[in-house]
Amino acid sequence: MGLTNCCSHEELMSRLVDSVKEISGFSSSRGFIGKIQGDLVRRITLLSPFFEELIDVNVELKKDQITGFEAMRIALDSSLELFRSVNGGSKLFQLFDRDSLVEKFRDMTVEIEAALSQIPYEKIEVSEEVREQVQLLHFQFKRAKERWEESDLQLSHDLAMAENVMDPDPIILKRLSQELQLTTIDELKKESHAIHEYFLSYDGDPDDCFERMSSLLKNLVDFVTMESSDPDPSTGSRIVSRHRSPVIPEYFRCPISLELMKDPVIVSTGQTYERSSIQKWLDAGHKTCPKSQETLLHAGLTPNYVLKSLIALWCESNGIELPQNQGSCRTTKIGGSSSSDCDRTFVLSLLEKLANGTTEQQRAAAGELRLLAKRNVDNRVCIAEAGAIPLLVELLSSPDPRTQEHSVTALLNLSINEGNKGAIVDAGAITDIVEVLKNGSMEARENAAATLFSLSVIDENKVAIGAAGAIQALISLLEEGTRRGKKDAATAIFNLCIYQGNKSRAVKGGIVDPLTRLLKDAGGGMVDEALAILAILSTNQEGKTAIAEAESIPVLVEIIRTGSPRNRENAAAILWYLCIGNIERLNVAREVGADVALKELTENGTDRAKRKAASLLELIQQTEGVAVTTVP
């Protein structure tokens, strides 16, 4: 499938230069992934002279030559996304997910090598020195994708020992802390915040991985704390120290009370405090962070579940009774067992703030309910039974964007529970959610789309959501959103279009053109979703006509030729619906090589794809030489 030109020749080269420049800034080592990342960054950086010379000498490129550079743009954009994710994320999560991460780096190497293969650098007028450098780099990329490094066996062994041994050897913990570059309390604090962010952004159920990360982080905190308190400890002194009363790690103490935290919360500056201590500080009228003295942007308090879990693990391993706090929803998973005691009194106090609080209090309470509802099933039931849903629905109309965002996301998390879906709809939420989808912040729009998808699982809700104007708003998000937003919109649209009436709404709303554009953008990551929606729309007469008028047949044939098994099946099904009873479209399909692609599909496709391909081939053969008569 061909790539569409994203911009002019000069703009394209400038983008490539800018991408390489940004990528070159990621060259510093990042623990166990450092060498793999460093090698890829170094090779990409060496491409810069090639792109810069093409700008300087203003070489005119032919259309077929530009294709390779556009493929390179897509590859470098994907590489940038990977580098940002790796360098800003949790090191422990990357350690546990290292095989997948290494595979992603390998995929990037393969993608860049494929792009270089499409660039005819031997025929482009650049200096001999630059041409030879590109040729050498191309060879290096080819060799790199064929000779990929295996996993670090020492690292795997150390991780297994640290996870499965009750009292890990300090030598192993030292190796791990050095490998992960978590050798100081400050670095461990940053890692704790990174795990916290990972937990908040994770779409699925993170508990198992979260528990493993928390347990290992706790061991590293113990080790680094012991190391820093005794710069040169002998083996004997370490053994003795383990029989003394455990020293509470500084990071577990509240900066205000200096006591072990029971209910750690994060303020807007990023500092963590014991809830009761910081609440007293705020109630006294203070507007600054006690530790940093920075002005607080708001009075909201976000539970630090990562730190709370670490404190629980530390108390358990040191034989200390776990501190109990009053008035909070507690969900703690220790040693593989999960306990959840959602404190109704605490939830009711949050609902009081939703109903009668200031804007800041409403924002903070909605944010806390959002997190609690995400945590587990029991919390979702507790929050709904306490009467939160109507109050959250009311706040969907809040003029404060952050409150609106928290409210729609809290409803999304509550809707995961099947029993809550009906309560959300009964509270009149659909119209307000659609309004957020139209006019909210980008994150609020994305979560509104996800909420509508969740609610649309119930068939009668599909009708109500479509009637409320959601389809047009979802199409806008499909065109304007981030990659995640596009996927949320596409998933919701697909589910809604199972209802026949919503197919017409989607077609009249102009969905076919953006879907066709997504089909043509191989690097956009939305081909699967676009095909799935088109497949369901092609069973509708209006949809069939609109898809054909969008000149989609050549694109569909290309997907049948080169796509994944599932995409080839969907493309064949769409083409079958378009061509049945329409000789003109059959002729177009034949002209772009459909017969060859379909013949191959009858041999190597899925069962459904084989049936559609065989039927289409028969139609094409029957209509050869027949005069064109159009049937809509």
UniProtKB/Swiss-Prot annotation:
Annotated positions for site Putative E2 binding site: 256, 281, 290
A biological-process GO annotation: protein ubiquitination
Pathway as given in its UniProt record: Protein modification; protein ubiquitination
Catalytic activity: S-ubiquitinyl-[E2 ubiquitin-conjugating enzyme]-L-cysteine + [acceptor protein]-L-lysine = [E2 ubiquitin-conjugating enzyme]-L-cysteine + N(6)-ubiquitinyl-[acceptor protein]-L-lysine
Name listed for the protein in its UniProt record: U-box domain-containing protein 14
ARM repeats: 377-416, 418-457, 459-498, 500-539, 541-580
Stored PROSITE patterns: ARM_REPEAT, U_BOX
Keywords: Repeat, Transferase, Ubl conjugation pathway
Function: Functions as an E3 ubiquitin ligase with specific E2 ubiquitin-conjugating enzymes. Undergoes auto-ubiquitination.
InterPro entries documented for this protein: ARM-like, ARM-type_fold, Armadillo, RING-Ubox_PUB, Ubox_domain, Znf_RING/FYVE/PHD
Expressed in which tissues: Expressed in flowers, green siliques, seeds and rosette leaves.
Assembly behavior: Homodimer. Interacts with SNL1. Binds to SD11, SD16, SD17, SD18, SD113, SD129 and SD25.
Domain remark in the UniProt entry: The U-box N-terminal domain (UND) is not required for in vitro ubiquitination activity.
